């Protein structure tokens, strides 16, 4: 198998750990053992100078917290979508929940400085759902992406708790700093901060590492934003006035 195929296999076991009633060909304990064994082999190949077992043990220790976070994401989707008939439906049928669940796993590996694997996980979710979440993004509990297609969340984005995004939202970089030789300066904060209890409607674009959307705010559809917004704000574009004329 290729590396992406092997990572897809690991990801399948990771989903079984977090949603055993849906993805569980193995029981949860068996899935944890499988993901640990497979992941340790890949980490040993990619990080020959590091202790692969120590890395995987640290990842494994974080799985209960990841499970808790994912459960809050399921609750947020069920509570926030009147079309949701059950939490089981959310887990089985909502692409946003799938993408966020994969992100929660990939983010833990990113935090452990594991190369390549988190990005492959993110791209597997991207190809399946149309939702592109960089594994470096920090996302609080009760996160819900409704519909999902076309959502982009950048590496240094920080998202608070109880945030909801709709399709086509971009949380991206505004511009990239270059050094004296013209090469990009990496490792800088490039993506926005979204505080608690924010709703961002379809096709809104929020850019820049110094941009903060204050808590309890709403960002309307198709808004293009590169400036910070105070808490309890509603941001929207002025509606164009339609011209109605007789065709006679």
Regions found by a protein language model. Name each.
Residues 1-123, 248:
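Terminal amphipathic alpha-helical/low-complexity segments used for targeting or macromolecular assembly
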Residues 129, 134-135, 140-141, 146-155, ...:
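Left-handed beta-helix
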């Amino acid at each position: 198998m290729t590396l992406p195929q092997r990572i897809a296999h690991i990801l399948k076991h990771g989903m079984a750990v977090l949603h055993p009633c849906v993805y569980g060909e193995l029981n949860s304990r068996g899935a944890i053992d499988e993901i640990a064994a497979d992941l340790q082999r890949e980490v040993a190949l990619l990080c020959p100078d590091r202790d692969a077992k120590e890395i995987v043990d640290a990842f494994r220790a974080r799985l209960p917290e990841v499970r808790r976070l994912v459960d809050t994401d399921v609750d947020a989707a069920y509570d926030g979508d009147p079309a949701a008939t059950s939490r089981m439906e959310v887990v089985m049928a909502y692409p946003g929940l799938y993408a966020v669940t994969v992100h929660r796993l990939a983010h833990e590996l990113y935090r452990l400085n594991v190369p390549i694997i988190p990005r492959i996980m993110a791209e597997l979710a991207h190809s399946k759902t149309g939702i592109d979440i960089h594994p470096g993004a920090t996302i609080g509990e009760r996160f819900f992406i409704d519909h999902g297609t076309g959502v982009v969340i950048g590496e240094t984005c920080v998202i608070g708790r109880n945030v909801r995004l709709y399709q086509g939202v971009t949380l991206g970089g505004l511009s990239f700093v270059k050094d004296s030789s013209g090469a990009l300066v990496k490792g800088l904060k490039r993506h926005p901060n979204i505080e608690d209890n924010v709703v961002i409607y379809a096709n809104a674009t929020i850019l820049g590492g110094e941009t903060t959307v204050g808590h309890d705010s709403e960002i309307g559809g198709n808004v293009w934003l590169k400036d910070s917004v105070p808490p309890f704000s509603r941001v929207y574009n002025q509606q164009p006035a339609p011209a109605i004329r007789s065709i006679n």
